[in-house]
């Protein structure tokens, strides 16, 4: 039988059924109050951090003796909302597995869509978002701006890592160098690194040493190789670029929290090809372009769309080289893509 095109209502019904199935599967693997009685040697409450999330179960790293630095696989109680890497939790040790009994409020969270388009948090309590890009695959300012807007909207400090600087040649260098100059003009921190030559690795280690950070970026930009250079014992699998698409193959399947030897915490996240902003309002998106902020509210018309209107403060700023034309173009593209969601 040939493939049949599904209507929007049919797709929504299928998605709803699949969502309920996933929820039932998670519920079967969570643990209720009665089941707690079946666990032997149920210990006192202690605190820890979610290192990796496997859905119904999580790995917790204890931060109190005798569990400091120890990774314990835990169920979660049925009344606890979803847990994600970086969550601070209260848990109780038990045999054969521990039990998470509470989750502390999140200071920040990073959100991305799942395979069904539903927004899911993927990491919690992070201070900085490291947006990794490279000469291959070719960096796109529109994608970088999506990451930056998402970070700004969450109140998380973003910075840029140009990886694989050893791959820059006379053809790719001008484009990438221009991109770097643009973001430096805006005021973003940029660190240039190469795993092959070790360029910038010490600078990056120092910058990461005092914070909880997360690496995000397209597949194939070298996040896993870079993490292995920062933390050799981590041994994240490395995927090559696909010859057919010149894009990377996905190698990381679940977000993982790593303690860096030089200090600081790093979360290694799955490759994100496009960063969803569907949960953000138009006001949040435009405020996510921090170089626009001095001009917002100064347009002649209150409903200015910053397109062709007379008296648009942003258009005037572009004409005066105070705002980059590419940034305004990317903003318009993001808003246009939002209208089609």
Protein language model regions, located:
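Helix-rich effector regions associated with P-loop NTPase G domains
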Residues: 2-14, 44, 72, 81-87, ...
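C-terminal effector/interaction modules appended to NTPase cores
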Residues: 1-152
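Canonical P-loop GTPase G-domain recognition
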Residues: 167-221
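Catalytic P-loop NTPase motifs of RecA-like helicase/translocase cores
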Residues: 139, 168, 199, 273-276
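Arginine/glycine-rich "motif VI" loop of SF2 helicases in the C-terminal RecA-like domain
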Residues: 150-157, 181-185, 294, 340
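Conserved beta-strand/loop subsegment of P-loop NTPase cores
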Residues: 126-133, 154-166, 186-193
């Amino acid at each position: 039988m040939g493939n049949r095109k599904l209507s929007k209502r049919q797709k929504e019904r299928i998605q709803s059924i699949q969502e309920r199935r996933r929820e039932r599967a998670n519920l079967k693997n969570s643990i209720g109050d009665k089941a707690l009685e079946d666990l032997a040697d149920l210990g006192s409450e202690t605190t820890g951090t979610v290192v990796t999330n496997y859905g119904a179960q999580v790995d917790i790293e204890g931060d109190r003796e005798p569990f400091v630095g120890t990774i314990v696989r835990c169920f979660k109680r049925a009344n606890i909302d979803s847990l994600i890497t970086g969550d601070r939790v209260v848990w109780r040790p038990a045999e054969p597995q521990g039990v998470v009994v509470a989750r502390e409020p999140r200071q920040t969270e990073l959100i991305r869509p799942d395979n069904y388009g539903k927004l899911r948090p993927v990491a919690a309590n992070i201070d900085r978002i490291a947006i990794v890009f490279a000469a291959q695959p070719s960096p796109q300012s529109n994608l970088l701006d999506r990451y930056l807007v998402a970070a700004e909207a969450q109140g998380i400090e973003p910075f840029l890592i140009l990886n694989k600087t050893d791959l820059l040649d006379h053809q790719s260098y001008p484009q990438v160098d221009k991109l770097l100059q643009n973001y430096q003009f805006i005021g973003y921190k940029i660190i240039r690194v190469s795993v092959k030559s070790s360029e910038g690795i010490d600078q990056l280690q120092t910058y990461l040493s005092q914070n909880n950070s997360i690496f995000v970026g397209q597949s194939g930009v070298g996040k896993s190789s870079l993490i292995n250079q920062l933390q050799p014992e981590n041994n994240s699998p490395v995927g090559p670029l696909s010859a057919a698409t010149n894009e990377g193959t996905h190698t990381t399947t679940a977000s993982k929290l790593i303690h860096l030897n030089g200090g600081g915490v790093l979360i290694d996240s799955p490759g994100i090809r496009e960063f969803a902003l569907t949960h953000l309002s138009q006001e949040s998106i435009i405020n996510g372009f921090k170089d626009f902020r001095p001009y917002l509210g100064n347009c002649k018309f209150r409903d200015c769309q910053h397109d062709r209107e007379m008296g648009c403060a942003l258009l005037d700023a572009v004409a005066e080289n105070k705002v980059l034309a590419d940034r305004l173009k990317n903003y318009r593209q993001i808003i246009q893509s939002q209208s089609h969601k």
